Amino acid sequence: DKRTMAPSSLLFYLGVNKRVGGLLHHNLFFDESFDQHAIDIYEQPRWPEKPLFYVCCPSKTDPSVAPEGSENIFILIPLAPDLQGDDEPTREKYYQMVMERLEAFTGTSVRDAVVYKRSYAHREFQQDYHAYKGNAYGLANTLLQTAFLKPKMKNRKVKGLYFSGQLTTPGPGVPPSLISGEVVAGEVSKMLGLPKN
């Protein structure tokens, strides 16, 4: 609990059996208070009353990701990590809330055309990725958790224990995570006296 975690997320993956006008590939729904949503994530962690959210509709730019005449829609609601109450009724409440706003924005009924729906949040981040407190992004990018203040690759207390990935040096993202793994592999090889590949 000494570190500040980045947000978690409530995600909805939707298959819709019709085209939805009014959406682009990337859509930000910042139609409610940004400040209040930030308070609900960082200062007073709780489920937001009026969440901001992101909608990705990749079928707008790549029709091959959905059957002809259909859409593939992804919805992301940023949330505080470690929230209690991540259950199906809560998820359904947020689904209805964002879909109401999405339908109002597009002027199109979408819910009746959903043929596939899956939600993903704290529980799955913990179960599938062992994500601390169910967070989605690891450590928050704060001044005291960047550059040389990031967690080190080599454990100071346990000999031979190394870490790699986005939470260590050099940082988040796929390329830095791969570089991190290469560096750790080199350190372990050196420790074991193995030749470099």
Predicted features by range, described:
Residues 1-66:
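Mid-domain catalytic core of redox enzymes
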Residues 19-20, 46-48, 88-127:
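Flavin-binding catalytic cores
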Residues 54, 108-170:
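A glycine-rich dinucleotide-binding beta-alpha-beta segment and adjacent secondary-structure elements
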Residues 63-70, 152-156:
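Short glycine/proline-enriched loop/turn "hinge" motifs that connect secondary-structure elements
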Residues 78-85:
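Amphipathic alpha-helix from the class-I
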Residues 166-189:
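A conserved FAD-binding loop/helix module that cradles the flavin
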Residues 190-197:
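Active-site-proximal substrate-binding core of FAD-dependent oxidoreductases
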